[in-house]
Amino acid sequence: LCAGQTGAGKSVFMNGLICSLLYRFTPDELRMILVDPKFIEFRSYQDIPHLLLPVVDDPNQAKVALKWAVREMERRYRILAKIGARNLASFNQKVEEMGAAVIRDILVSEDTGEEMPSSVQSAGHDWMEAFEPDEAGVPRIGKLPYIVIIIDELADLMMVAKKDVEISIARIAQKARAAGIHLVVATQRPSTDVVTGLIKANLPSRVSFQLASFVDSKTILDKSGAERLLGQGDMLFIPPGSSQPSRLHGAYVDDEEIGKITAFVKSQGKPTYRNEILLDDEADEDEFESDADPKFDEAVSLVRNAGHASASFIQRHLKVGYNRAARMIEDMESRGIVGPADGARPREVLLR
């Protein structure tokens, strides 16, 4: 959680943070979602290969992206549980060391002892489909990258969709770390209607630049001090597990340096955008009644031809939101078109 008034150095700090990540991680190791309601702060990073999405400047799209991050967090925890890993680093190490043997162990059925054929894919844009069957119905897995979500101005998001944004941020902050998903939230208006108690309680790591008043400092740090900082990168930092702030000075990164860094990174490869992240389930719900989805017949035809079924498979091919695709799968199961979920195995298609 980062706060600072205009000119205090907050934006320079965010740029320094992003550049440090670009120096340390390849796109296979780290993917980012940058939310920039002010349109100008993160423009320099457009089209770098680390991005999951083009820089998000629409608060409604940011709300949908945060909901996706919650679903991805839950999906990753299911994968970590199957493989017996406590965190993402342990998971990636197991995949690297054991390869296909890991998949074979995971896909052995406890009931029948039968093994499913498996394939291991390298890290990259296919990581979003880990444990999903490919076109041939073969489950696959690969290394999972870290995901960092950076929000430049929280106030704009809270004005548009306060409840959804607050819940998503709280859920990601309180349990996504072990799944490799991290969140940086910044604001220049640290009032209690923007930085709510729920958000603050779940973001224990705080950075405060110069603030206008004691009240603002109390909101961010739970103590005074930020109102007496000097500006231009002078900050107080409270790490997780500590109640005492440390006084630091942020690194200065100018526009020319950012331009050189991003130009080099862009020369190494193009981004693989996953625009299905922004498919809005609420918009889908406005278009149809739950018992009469106009794309249901198309989805049935798709899974019959493929011979396997999953919500992610329908989402990718029909370009619908995840929740809508999941409802179609549940409807198919209730009608006897597909079988029940069976751990890592793809659902069996009963209708031929």
Residue ranges and their predicted role:
Residues 1-122, 129, 137-211, 215-229, ...:
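P-loop NTPase catalytic phosphate-binding loop
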Residues 136-138, 239-352:
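Conserved alpha/beta core segments of nucleic-acid transaction machinery
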